[in-house]
Regions:
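Histidine-acidic metal/acid-base catalytic patches
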Residues: 2-8, 12-33, 40, 44-67, ...
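Active-site acidic/histidine proton-transfer and metal-coordination neighborhood
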Residues: 17-18, 22-25, 80-82, 125, ...
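Hydrophobic faces of well-ordered beta-strands that scaffold small-molecule active sites
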Residues: 64-69, 93-95, 126-131, 156-158, ...
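Active-site mouth loops of central-metabolism enzymes
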Residues: 66-76, 130-138, 171
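Active-site beta-loop-alpha junctions enriched in small/polar residues
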Residues: 71-73, 98-100, 131-134, 161, ...
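Catalytic domains of carbohydrate-active enzymes, especially glycoside hydrolases
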Residues: 81-98, 151-152
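Glycine-rich, proline-tolerant flexible connector loops at the mouths of alpha/beta enzymes
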Residues: 96-114
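Alpha-helix-loop-beta-strand connector modules within alpha/beta enzyme cores
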Residues: 112-127, 184
Length: 367
């Protein structure tokens, strides 16, 4: 049966995930000598600090960059979007460089420099851009990478690898991507750029749980191919302790996308957007919520990122809804029409609160 093959592959991955902290601890003990192994941490259980090798994004003494995803600023031009992000205290902005985004694919050579200049004018960095490039055959792919290289940009978010066909064997559906990813790796090597594939939750998405995405990319050089771990999306797939996935995939984790979710009964009154489920009669579903009010274990995620020297982007990806006075229904914080649907000061106060939450979690993690 196809599902049994899928579950067998997943079990193998999870066995490795479970072994990873132990392997890291043994390696550390061998390096340190008797009695000098790495200590544990956490509440009620031992949490090994993980492998001592820094992540590829590590900057000596550096900290993760709190980065606002510009999809929530589509109502503003480059200058206003960057100024608004800075007003809310963000360190950086992740421009949408795709259809319907701030920079359109056909205009990337002309307009991406303008967007980067606007960010710099506002005192923001641009550690990552969001693109449609999942392989080397995507239209304008080489123009994207050439422009990024000239601007000194390294990382771009790549979209998920499509949808599973559950009527067919699943492993070949991962394997078919490997030559395409290899071609993109070579293109990235040419331009000094790096693709980070996003773990998009939801039924049927290839790579949505993280473990299967890692199986697709694990043999590629993390200088050029990596993962953008969506903490909320992976929690949606695996529960609050799925953060331990990062322990096994740490060399490939080059970007972190943050949102928060909780599991709710479908009969509960909705407080935010919900994901569809593979089984429509299943009573539980996932709902997006304000960061810090859901199931995502930000504390332990960030503590582990600290232990591996992570200094990449923390990309704010929240998809919760906001109550607006006079509105007939809550408004999405992900795609608000400001000021028509939501006053600008209300938008700013929400994303500022979110930034303060992430900053507090990073501080508690020792950053």
């Amino acid at each position: 049966m196809e599902m049994s093959k899928f579950l067998e592959s997943r079990r193998e991955a999870l066995k490795l995930l479970g072994a990873a902290p132990f392997v890291a601890a043994v390696a550390s003990a061998q390096q340190s000598g008797p009695g000098q192994g790495r200590g544990g941490r956490g509440r009620g259980a031992t949490h090994f600090e993980g492998p001592p090798t820094p992540s590829p994004t590590a900057i000596p003494g550096g900290k993760p960059l709190l980065t606002l995803y510009s999809i929530s600023l589509q109502w503003a031009d480059y200058d206003e979007a960057a100024a608004t992000a800075a007003e809310a205290g963000w360190h950086a902005i992740g421009w949408t460089v795709r259809g319907g985004g701030h920079v359109l694919p056909e205009n990337v050579a002309r307009d991406l420099p303008k967007a980067v200049a606007a960010a710099k004018k506002a005192g923001l960095q641009v550690p990552i851009i969001i693109t449609p490039i999942r392989d080397a055959e995507v239209q304008y792919a080489e123009t994207y990478l050439d422009t990024m290289s000239k601007l000194g940009l390294r990382y771009y978010q790549a979209p998920p690898l499509g949808q599973y066909d559950y009527a067919k064997d699943l492993q070949p559906q991962l394997d078919i991507w490997k030559p395409r990813i290899e071609a993109l790796e070579k293109l990235n090597e040419k331009y000094g750029t790096t693709a980070v594939y996003h773990t998009e939750g939801g039924a049927g998405n290839i790579g949505g749980g993280g473990w299967d995405l890692w199986l697709a990319i694990k043999d590629f050089d993390p200088k050029y191919i990596g993962m953008d771990i969506g903490l909320g999306h992976c929690t949606m797939k695996g529960g609050p302790e799925v953060w331990e996935l990062i322990r096994f995939t740490h060399k490939s984790v080059l970007s972190i996308a943050c949102n928060d979710i909780r599991w709710v009964k479908k009969t509960d009154p909705p407080k935010g957007p919900r994901r569809s489920d593979p089984s429509q009669d299943w009573p539980w579903t996932a709902e997006y919520v304000i960061p810090g009010t859901g199931m995502v274990n930000f504390r332990d995620h960030f503590a582990y990122l600290k232990s591996i020297g992570y200094a990449g982007s923390i990309l704010h990806y929240s998809e919760y809804f906001v109550d607006v006075q006079g509105a007939s229904q809550p408004i999405s914080i992900l795609r608000p029409n400001v000021p028509k649907d939501m006053p600008k000061d209300l938008y700013v106060s929400n994303v500022e609160r979110d930034r303060e939450f992430y900053a507090r979690m990073l501080a508690e993690a020792g950053f």
